[in-house]
Each structure stands twice: as C-alpha cells, then as structure tokens.
C-alpha cells in the first residue's frame, strides 16, 4: 500500500497566512514564488541492494530538503554487482551524469511498482529516491509566483492510500535548530475525498544541511582557460564557525577532466585518476574529489583536461561543472542524522561523520571549454603534413648533394 505525505514550506508567517486555504476536500496554496513542496511517496518492496538516486538542477537546500548534487547521481551501497560505468568509493559505488539517463534509474527500479521512473516530473522537480526493502520517493518542487496548487486525497492514487498534508513556515531557522509552525491534515480513506482531521503542528529538529549565503563566497574560472583549468574559491571574508569546522569543495568531475593527486593532493579522490589516458579510454564516468579549503584567502583548485576524440565541427566541448563549497562541522549530536523530512545516507555525506552539519556556501555552475579536434580538418592537415614532409626531404637532399659540389669547386680553383 502506498502512503503519501505532502509538505508545503512558506518563507514566512505572513506568506503562510495569506497563501494557504483549507476546506473539507482540499488545501489550496497561492504561491508568491519560492515556496517548496515536498511530496514523499512510500511503498513496500521485495528487497534488493540499497540504492539512492538523486536528481537536481542546482541549489536545493532548505529547511525541508538536503543539498543534492546537480545532475543525476546513483549510489549503490557496498558497491557490488555494478557496471564499469560506476566509480568505487568509500562504502558505495557511484554513477553520475550531468544529463538525465533514465536507463541508469530503471536498472535498479522495482518492476512491480505501479509508478515507474517515466512518470516522475524530472523536468520540473528535484528527487531524492531510496530503493531497497522499501521504496521512498521524495519530490521537491519550487512554486512560481502566481501559481495555485490544490492538495487533495487524489495524491494517493487509490482510496486505500494513506495521505497526509502539512503546510508550514519557519518560526526558527538559525542554522542550529529549525522550528516549523503550521497545520497538517489527514484524509479519509473511503473514497469521499474529504479531510479526516486537521490540527496545529509544531515541528522541531536539528538540520543536517543549512544554506549560508553570507558572507559571500565567489567561485570563478581563471581566464584564459587552457588545457589546465583553474578554479578560484574566494574565502577572503570567511572564517571558520568553530574549532570542529572546516571548509571543503566537492567536485564530480566528468571523464573530460581530472586532478593530479601528486601535484595537488586532495583529501579524498575516488574514480579515474590516470594522468595519461585520453577521454575515450576512460571506462567510468569520471571521479569524485574533495579538497580542503583555507578560510581567509583565495583558494585555487588545479584541473586538467584529457585528450578528446576528434569530432566533426566543434573545436571545443563545453563541460558543465558545479563545485560545491561548504563548511562541515562535527556537532557530537546524534539528532543530526535524520529529521522528519530527510535522512543522511549515501552521497558525499557518507565521506563525513554521521553528526556532521553541512553549511552550504556556494555552488556556482561553471562552463569549462575543453579542446576537441575537428575531424573536418583532417584532409587539410594531411595535405599540409605531406607537403611539409616532401619539402623537408627535398631540402635535406639539396643540402647533402650541394656540399660536395661546392667543395670540389673550391679545390679546382
């Protein structure tokens, strides 16, 4: 049986009072823009390996959502029985793609479920999905200004489904504690579509992910961009929040890019680290890298481009990359691991302790141009090469045969 929980998070009490209406059959939300709707669907499953699938277009962190890596990421606990596309990391195997690849999701999705990956709203929303003994699909959608959404019992899909809806605003959100105030309703399971009970609700918990936009942290690509791109992370105006805190940058590098662990040793590096292989010889999707950053200064991360297989037309391939700059703080609190809306698990969170709070500073998208040979130039390159070889042979022959003639002329004189 499916259970569905819908949560709407307003930015303030004022927006909550003005934007939420409730009657016997629906909760209607009138958005000002920026409201987050989390829909959690849960089913029992036959079992299998524990897998986490995430999909995001950028920044997702809020009081009810963690920070998900941009693009598609698939994490398999233990890392056994995965294809060569995966990277073996600490306690997990990882697959990543900047684009949505539904085949990578279908490979782990239970076939018996009524809802299949094609039915999800990939183009509009972010997803945090857990597969295994149960299937849990957390959908995060941001509402646009002027958008109106009606939340009803129909979200359950069937009359037997358990449906719960909550509408909240943050009463306290200071980075250490979150207190959400609002109301929540349950729905009758008799096909009437009417609410069962509604009650005021106060939720208090400690978040594992916090958005920290101030002080500003800049992420830039040093110009001009060469075969060895350099990323600058400006932490000049930033200091550590405490003795148990440290700043890091997390990178998911596609096959076109890599780091030299000998030139600039990272804290963690999983995946393709061969310094000589061209892109088309790399088997896995790329690598995951974490570097320690020093607050109070501009930090540089040195990348390198792999030689790419030539193709028609393009002289450069633009590779998107989104570095995640965050401060990781050990708290000593067991309450950090999970809260009513998300729990820490696989992903970059697995590289830190269970009591770590992630304070996210910036995640600017960078577009890195990687040189790629133009196969349309092959005929002209071959023509010039042949001419150069012929000219070289003629010139060398001329020099070899000219010297004896000149010497004999001097001798006869």
Curated annotation (Swiss-Prot):
Membrane topology (Lumenal): 1-378
TM segment ranges: 379-401
Principal localisation: endoplasmic reticulum
Pfam families hit by this protein: PIG-X
Compartment(s) where it occurs, according to its Swiss-Prot or TrEMBL record: Endoplasmic reticulum membrane
Residues the record marks as carrying a glycan: 362
Recorded superkingdom: Eukaryota
Pathway: Glycolipid biosynthesis; glycosylphosphatidylinositol-anchor biosynthesis
Membrane topology field: Single-pass type III membrane protein
InterPro entries, per database record: Pbn1, PIG-X/PBN1
A GO CC annotation given for this chain: glycosylphosphatidylinositol-mannosyltransferase I complex
Membrane topology, Cytoplasmic segments: 402-413
Keywords on record: Endoplasmic reticulum, Glycoprotein, GPI-anchor biosynthesis, Membrane, Transmembrane, Transmembrane helix
UniProt record, GO biological process: GPI anchor biosynthetic process
Family: Belongs to the PIGX family.
Function description: Required for proper folding and/or the stability of a subset of proteins in the endoplasmic reticulum. Component of glycosylphosphatidylinositol-mannosyltransferase 1 which transfers the first of the 4 mannoses in the GPI-anchor precursors during GPI-anchor biosynthesis. Probably acts by stabilizing the mannosyltransferase GPI14.
This protein's name: Protein PBN1
The species this protein was found in: Eremothecium gossypii (strain ATCC 10895 / CBS 109.51 / FGSC 9923 / NRRL Y-1056)
């Amino acid at each position: 049986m499916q259970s569905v929980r819908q949560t709407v998070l307003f930015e303030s009490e004022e927006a909550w009072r003005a934007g939420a209406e409730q009657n016997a059959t629906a909760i209607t939300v009138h958005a000002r823009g920026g409201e987050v709707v989390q829909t959690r669907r849960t089913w029992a499953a036959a079992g299998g390996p524990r897998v986490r699938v995430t999909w995001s277009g950028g920044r997702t962190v809020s009081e009810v959502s963690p920070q998900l890596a941009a693009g598609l990421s698939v994490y398999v606990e233990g890392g056994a029985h995965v294809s060569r596309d995966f990277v073996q990391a600490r306690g997990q195997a990882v697959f990543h793609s900047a684009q949505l690849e539904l085949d990578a999701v279908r490979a782990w999705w239970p076939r018996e479920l009524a809802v299949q990956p094609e039915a999800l709203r990939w183009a509009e929303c972010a997803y945090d999905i857990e597969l295994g003994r149960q299937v849990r699909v957390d959908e995060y959608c941001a509402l646009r200004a002027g958008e109106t959404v009606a939340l009803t019992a129909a979200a359950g899909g069937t009359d037997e489904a358990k449906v719960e809806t909550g509408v909240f605003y943050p009463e306290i959100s200071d980075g250490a504690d979150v207190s959400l105030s609002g109301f929540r309703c349950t729905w009758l399971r008799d096909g009437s579509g009417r609410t069962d009970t509604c009650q005021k609700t106060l939720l208090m918990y400690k978040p594992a992910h916090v958005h920290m936009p101030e002080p500003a942290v800049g992420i830039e690509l040093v110009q001009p961009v060469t075969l060895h791109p350099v990323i600058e992370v400006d932490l000049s105006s930033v200091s550590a929040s405490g003795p148990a805190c440290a700043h890091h940058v997390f990178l998911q590098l596609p096959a076109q890019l890599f780091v030299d662990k000998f030139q600039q040793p990272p804290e963690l590096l999983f995946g393709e680290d061969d310094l000589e292989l061209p892109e088309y010889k790399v088997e896995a999707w790329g690598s995951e890298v974490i570097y320690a950053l020093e607050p109070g200064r501009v930090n540089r991360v040195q990348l390198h481009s792999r030689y790419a297989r030539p193709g028609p037309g393009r002289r450069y391939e633009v590779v998107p990359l989104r570095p995640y700059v965050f401060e990781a703080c050990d708290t000593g609190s067991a309450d950090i691991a999970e809260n009513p809306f998300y729990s820490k698990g696989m992903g970059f969170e697995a590289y830190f302790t269970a009591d770590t709070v992630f304070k996210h500073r910036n995640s600017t998208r960078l577009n890195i141009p990687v040189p790629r040979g133009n196969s349309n130039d092959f005929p002209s390159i071959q023509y010039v090469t042949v001419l150069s070889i012929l000219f070289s042979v003629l010139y060398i022959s001329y020099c070899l045969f000219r010297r004896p003639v000149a010497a004999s002329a001097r001798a006869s004189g």
